[in-house]
UniProtKB/Swiss-Prot annotation:
Binding residues annotated for Mg(2+), in chain numbering: 71, 90
Pathway the protein acts in: Cofactor biosynthesis; thiamine diphosphate biosynthesis; thiamine phosphate from 4-amino-2-methyl-5-diphosphomethylpyrimidine and 4-methyl-5-(2-phosphoethyl)-thiazole: step 1/1
EC number(s) on file: 2.5.1.3
Catalytic activity: 2-[(2R,5Z)-2-carboxy-4-methylthiazol-5(2H)-ylidene]ethyl phosphate + 4-amino-2-methyl-5-(diphosphooxymethyl)pyrimidine + 2 H(+) = thiamine phosphate + CO2 + diphosphate; 2-(2-carboxy-4-methylthiazol-5-yl)ethyl phosphate + 4-amino-2-methyl-5-(diphosphooxymethyl)pyrimidine + 2 H(+) = thiamine phosphate + CO2 + diphosphate; 4-methyl-5-(2-phosphooxyethyl)-thiazole + 4-amino-2-methyl-5-(diphosphooxymethyl)pyrimidine + H(+) = thiamine phosphate + diphosphate
Gene this chain is encoded by: thiE
Protein name: Thiamine-phosphate synthase
Physiological role: Condenses 4-methyl-5-(beta-hydroxyethyl)thiazole monophosphate (THZ-P) and 2-methyl-4-amino-5-hydroxymethyl pyrimidine pyrophosphate (HMP-PP) to form thiamine monophosphate (TMP).
Keyword terms of this UniProt record: Magnesium, Metal-binding, Thiamine biosynthesis, Transferase
Cross-referenced InterPro entries: Aldolase_TIM, ThiamineP_synth_sf, ThiamineP_synth_TenI, TMP_synthase
Binding residues annotated for 2-[(2R,5Z)-2-carboxy-4-methylthiazol-5(2H)-ylidene]ethyl phosphate, in chain numbering: 136-138, 166, 186-187
A GO term, aspect molecular function: magnesium ion binding
Length: 208
């Protein structure tokens, strides 16, 4: 049975050393009830990341939104996260699946690489992500993933597909039409005057 959590807005936090501001931003955005929220931080300070992740995890639990950690299985386990999202350099997928157990979410970044998506599914991924779909301010040098990957993925893979990279309300519908079940978004929500309202607007795209 498909995981009903894996459809809708996949909100990703901006990278910020200012914990107070970040937590306040997340609290506002969660009012829009995204499907998932991912804590993503490239800060080198492990203590800062742990502190931020714990506070955001608590907000997600209160809001009833699954909390995912980017890049770090260790941090996901330390914060009792609902799942982890791993890229190419973030460890063995089979080991991550075993450590998480069957009830938590394992997501895999596949860039524009079809074989990696197939391997991720074989390792027990709950969803696979392709991107960047559009040019992205968050990762300007990211490879581009054509919408045809989503068309093929919907036809040939048994897990939901996440789209990431430059997604906005203006271009989201075509990505959903191609086959994406999750839209991973940072800037278009967190840069909005009302992040909660912006997040809620994405939800309506999936209700149509």
């Amino acid at each position: 049975m498909p995981d009903t959590r894996l459809r809708g807005l996949y909100l990703i936090t901006p990278d910020s050393p200012d914990t107070t501001t970040l937590v306040a931003q997340v609290e506002r955005a969660l009012r829009g009830q995204p499907a998932l929220l991912q804590y993503r931080s490239k800060q080198r300070d492990a203590a800062l990341r742990l502190g931020q992740a714990r506070q955001i995890a608590a907000l997600c639990r209160e809001a009833g939104v699954p909390f995912i950690v980017n890049d770090s299985l260790e941090l996901a386990l330390a914060t009792d996260a609902d799942g982890v999202h791993l890229g190419r350099e973030d460890g063995d997928l089979d080991a991550a699946r075993r450590a998480l157990g069957p009830g938590r979410i394992l997501g895999v970044t596949c860039y524009n690489e079809w074989p990696r998506a197939v391997a991720g599914c074989a390792a027990g991924a709950d969803y696979v992500a392709f991107g960047a779909v559009f040019p992205s301010a968050t990762k300007p040098a990211a490879v581009r993933a054509p919408l045809e990957l989503f068309v093929r993925g919907r036809r040939e893979l048994d897990v939901p597909l996440a789209a990431i990279g430059g997604i906005t309300l203006d271009n989201a519908a075509q990505v959903i039409a191609a086959g994406a079940s999750l839209l991973a978004v940072v800037s278009d929500v967190f840069d909005a005057p009302d992040p909660g309202a912006r997040a809620a607007a994405y939800r309506t795209l999936f209700d149509a």
